[in-house]
């Protein structure tokens, strides 16, 4: 009986978490889904950003982070039940952050695999970052 209950709990938890893994493509930028760029300001300046995206740094240049600060800014942009996408340089940081947001906090997250570098490689023209 305990095994059945444990199995049901795991299944229910998996169903609640809504994490999608999608390749970052120029076509994705045309969708009507908010894109949150979690890179650093230096990275935003270096490559530019996706047009219409929102910039909220998660990890700073030294790898430090503040979940509270990030969530405060995120919650000003998206509703808890609203689907949104995360992008970083190549998808490593967003892989970790999107999994955390989805599995621990039940956000509806799309991880843009390959990041901004994949989009640029496929011909996407970023816009300059303005503070």
Please give the residue ranges for each predicted region.
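Structural scaffold elements adjacent to functional motifs in cytosolic proteins
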Residues: 35-37
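Hydrophobic h-region of N-terminal signal peptides that target proteins for export
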Residues: 5-17
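N-terminal hydrophobic targeting signals that begin at the initiator methionine
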Residues: 1-2
């Amino acid at each position: 009986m305990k095994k059945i209950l444990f199995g049901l709990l795991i299944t229910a938890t998996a169903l609640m978490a809504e994490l999608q893994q999608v390749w970052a493509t120029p076509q994705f930028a045309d969708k009507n889904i908010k894109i949150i760029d979690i890179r650093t300001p230096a990275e935003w300046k270096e490559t530019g950003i996706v047009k219409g995206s929102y910039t909220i740094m998660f990890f700073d240049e030294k790898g430090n982070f503040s979940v509270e600060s990030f969530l405060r800014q995120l919650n000003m942009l998206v509703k808890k039940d609203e689907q949104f996408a995360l992008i970083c340089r190549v998808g490593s940081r967003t892989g970790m952050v999107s999994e955390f947001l989805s599995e621990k906090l039940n956000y509806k997250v799309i991880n843009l695999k390959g990041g901004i570098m994949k989009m640029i490689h496929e011909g996407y023209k970023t816009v300059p970052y303005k503070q």
